[in-house]
């Protein structure tokens, strides 16, 4: 399976249902470059849903996401990979992803990003499920690209256990993401 067939089958197998309002979809530019910015409450599933929705409207859509998604062959054409596990933000694989993203936009295409760079959690002063502050690299990309920015919001959350575990150690959050994906 590939493209829309892949996204449809994956979401069906995971029993994931989502709602996208037509009046919001109508605001997505049909031509020209833009950056779609979104919160990141679920993990990989956000990227899958984003690709499903946007690639129906814009076949040139790609998302900047975890390089592991490119290991899923039908996802690879939609992903500009970055490595969120690097200690140094300036590491080569993420910088090459940044260059690829800018090239993709300069060719008139559209790009989705999760500017916080990691999945939302409750480890904040409000004890609410929130994205952390946007990564400086995301802000630099937006500024350097100088294209319209379109917001997308996922109204979703992971399990209570996920948020509790992330308080114990942040890496537990990462380890639990695959199980969260299949338990929606």
Language model feature labels by segment:
Residues 1-37, 47-49, 56-58, 76-77:
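Membrane-anchoring hydrophobic helices of lipid-metabolizing enzymes
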Residues 35-91:
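Catalytic core of membrane glycerolipid acyltransferases/transacylases, capturing the structured
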Residues 53, 103, 140-141:
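Hydrophobic/aromatic ligand-binding patch that stacks against planar heteroaromatic rings
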Residues 88-98, 130-136:
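Active-site glycine-rich loop that binds ribose-phosphate moieties when present
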Residues 97-107:
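Short amphipathic alpha-helices and their capping/turn segments at secondary-structure boundaries
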Residues 107-118:
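A structural motif
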Residues 110, 122-184:
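A cross-family acyltransferase "interaction/gating" segment
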